[in-house]
């Protein structure tokens, strides 16, 4: 036990977490040089393509330290993106310490701060590491001061390394062996094992990643899931060295994987406690706080035959991704599907892409919305996550929208641009502090504005230097309206959006123009209108395609021409009564891009 070290690597996006973990694996000889690949832990295709870490991964390595002792390192590589912060908090719950990796060129960023505070709240030992010192732009002295100034941990003797070239990585390992405490726990007590993560394997069923807090887990033990009371048999267990390696025993303080032939996806929820059936622990371990989804969107299969497959896929994915929320929903325009809750737009994109890739589905997504709090005239409080569920305007006493507290860190020269952007997004400034060349800004901005495109716009106004961390604070009363889209006087429920009355006119007009470009021309006029209640605020028409019926008349009598035109007109009129309009997938996504390219 004294030789075990459990730690995570936390950092902002692109500060070199995954590369550093590659080097640590190489030094400890977890893989032969032939098996080594760049970012060996980012095993999903999607992670490799986008160059980001999405799922936290764990590895167990043996390291012979300079003091001659053999240490067992269990470490978990975590994502840096704000949308995946729950992955980070789950990983940290299984550790005693964390490496805080900071890019020596870019310095401290908002996400570094947020993840570091999460670690400090859980009483972990945080070891600062300055990475990328091989870059010409690196200023380790300045960044060390910045860490002290902004984060508040002593970084004067922070380890300096370059994960890419491998300089100083040995020192990083030595430092963490010294500074991070050994796990606490008692191997003689009843078993308590925390489920950190689980995923679905087509051959093995549910595979869980567990951290043994007390007791020991042996192969063949009968184990009990504490929240459901179900009893299973521990068929196989082992560790990752990134490869799966079977073991017979997982000792106290270790992190490993476990297969016990659970077929049911809800059999072993993440954050649950496992114990022995014959001598159960008295109380479960404190799990993780449930993450509330911030963004909701409807997901519908393109062909309704895929509905069953889609439901299974969502089930398997939600096992692997504890923050995904979903419930069945039906729409008159799109048929049956699910209303899903996500942590942010990136999370939504990733989930949609994983569903389409890993499960071969074709999906249509409706525009994302946030949750609104509605007080009706009969003084009931409702929570509405989709525009179509909003009660009629005259039944609403008060509509409250969620407000997000946004912490931004940016260089001084971009301050003006960023403040302009925040004001445009209806933000209210609550705090501003200067740290050397950096400015820390705090704004309260409506969640709806943050999830739409705030992050992208923030990056582009600051040339990528600003960083953002946001969290939900409260609901605040606001003048919101629902804008409906009518196509040939029929409401399309999937296209409705909730927006602030001040922006409604503009958003409505923009959306209608966008739809006009996307809907293909038919044999009759298509009227596209945006309306608030019964009040039309914008309209445009997709013009009909007309055959030139007069082409065959040479000169001749005007009444002949009139007759032909009249006949065409009547035909068009009849067509319009029976014709219906097919909306392309792009049309549903048009709402996302309203107000982006102005």
Swiss-Prot record:
Q: Which InterPro entries match?
A: EF-4, EFG_III/V, EFG_V-like, EFTu-like_2, G_TR_CS, LepA_C_sf, LepA_CTD, LepA_IV
Q: Which reaction does it catalyse?
A: GTP + H2O = GDP + phosphate + H(+)
The UniProt keywords, alphabetically, are:
Cell inner membrane, Cell membrane, GTP-binding, Hydrolase, Membrane, Nucleotide-binding, Protein biosynthesis
- A single GO cellular-component term on record: plasma membrane
GO MF terms here are:
GTP binding; GTPase activity; guanosine tetraphosphate binding; ribosome binding; translation elongation factor activity
Source organism's superkingdom?
Answer: Bacteria
- The keyword Lyase is annotated on this UniProt entry: no
Q: Which residues form the signal peptide?
A: none
Task: Name the major location.
Answer: membrane
- Domain tr-type G residue range list: 2-184
Per the record, the GO terms for biological process are: positive regulation of translation
Positions that bind GTP: 14-19, 131-134
* PANTHER family reported in the protein's UniProt record: TRANSLATION FACTOR GUF1 HOMOLOG, CHLOROPLASTIC, TRANSLATION FACTOR GUF1-RELATED
For this protein, the record's HAMAP family field holds: LepA
What's this protein's family per the entry?
A: Belongs to the TRAFAC class translation factor GTPase superfamily. Classic translation factor GTPase family. LepA subfamily.
- This chain belongs to which protein, by name? Elongation factor 4
**Species whose genome carries this gene:** Photorhabdus laumondii subsp. laumondii (strain DSM 15139 / CIP 105565 / TT01)
Lineage runs:
Bacteria, Pseudomonadati, Pseudomonadota, Gammaproteobacteria, Enterobacterales
């Amino acid at each position: 036990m004294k030789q075990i070290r459990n730690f995570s690597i936390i950092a902002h996006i692109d500060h070199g977490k995954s590369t550093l973990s590659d080097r640590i694996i190489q030094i400890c000889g977890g893989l032969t040089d032939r098996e080594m690949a760049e970012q060996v832990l980012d095993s999903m295709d999607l992670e490799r393509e986008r160059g980001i870490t999405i799922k936290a991964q764990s590895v167990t390595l043996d390291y012979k330290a300079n003091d001659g002792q053999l240490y067992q390192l269990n470490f978990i590589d975590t994502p840096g993106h704000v949308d995946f912060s729950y992955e980070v908090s789950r990983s940290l719950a299984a550790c005693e310490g964390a490496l805080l990796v900071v890019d020596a060129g870019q310095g401290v960023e908002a996400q570094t701060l947020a993840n570091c505070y999460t670690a400090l709240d859980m009483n972990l030992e945080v070891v600062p590491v300055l990475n990328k010192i091989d870059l010409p732009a690196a200023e380790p002295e300045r960044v060390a001061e910045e860490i002290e100034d902004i984060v508040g941990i002593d970084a004067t003797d922070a380890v300096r390394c370059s994960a890419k070239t491998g300089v100083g990585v040995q020192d990083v390992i030595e430092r963490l062996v010294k500074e991070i405490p050994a796990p606490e726990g008692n191997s003689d007590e009843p078993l308590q094992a925390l489920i950190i993560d689980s995923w679905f394997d087509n051959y093995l069923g549910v595979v869980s990643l567990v951290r043994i807090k007390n007791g020991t887990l042996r192969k063949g033990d009968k184990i009990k899931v504490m929240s459901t009371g179900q009893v299973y048999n521990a068929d196989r267990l082992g560790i990752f060295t990134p490869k799966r390696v079977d073991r017979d025993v997982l000792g106290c303080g270790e992190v490993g994987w476990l297969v016990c032939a659970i077929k049911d996806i809800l059999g072993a929820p993440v954050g649950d406690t496992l114990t022995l059936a014959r001598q159960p622990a008295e109380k479960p371990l404190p799990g993780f706080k449930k993450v509330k989804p911030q963004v909701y969107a409807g997901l519908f299969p393109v062909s309704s035959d895929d509905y069953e497959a889609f439901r299974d896929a969502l089930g398997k994915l939600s096992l692997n991704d504890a923050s995904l929320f979903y419930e069945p929903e039906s729409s008159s325009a799109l048929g049956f599907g699910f209303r899903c809750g996500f942590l942010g737009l990136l999370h939504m994109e990733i989930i949609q892409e994983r569903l389409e890739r890993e499960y071969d589905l074709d999906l249509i997504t409706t525009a994302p919305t946030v949750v609104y709090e509605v007080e009706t005239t009969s003084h009931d409080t409702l929570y509405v996550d989709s525009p179509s569920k909003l009660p009629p305007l005259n039944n609403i006493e008060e509509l409250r929208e969620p407000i997000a507290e946004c912490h931004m860190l940016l260089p001084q020269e971009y301050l003006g641009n960023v403040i302009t952007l925040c004001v445009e997004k209806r933000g209210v400034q609550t705090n501003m502090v200067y740290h050397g060349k950096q400015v820390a800004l705090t704004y309260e901005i409506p969640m709806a504005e943050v999830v739409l495109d705030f992050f992208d716009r923030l990056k582009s106004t600051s040339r990528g230097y600003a960083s953002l961390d946001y969290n939900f604070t409260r609901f605040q009363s606001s003048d919101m309206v629902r804008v409906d889209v009518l196509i040939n006087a029929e409401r399309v429920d999937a296209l409705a959006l909730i927006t602030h009355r001040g922006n409604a006119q503009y958003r409505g007009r923009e959306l209608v123009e966008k739809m006009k470009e996307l809907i293909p021309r038919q044999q009759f006029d298509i009227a596209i209108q945006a309306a608030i209640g019964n009040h039309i605020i914008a309209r445009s028409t997709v013009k009909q395609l007309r055959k030139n019926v007069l082409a065959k008349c040479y000169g001749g009598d005007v009444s002949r021409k009139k007759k032909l035109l009249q006949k065409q007109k009547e035909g068009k009129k009849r067509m319009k009564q029976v014709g219906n309009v097919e909306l392309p997938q792009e049309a549903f996504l048009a709402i996302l891009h309203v107000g982006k390219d102005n």
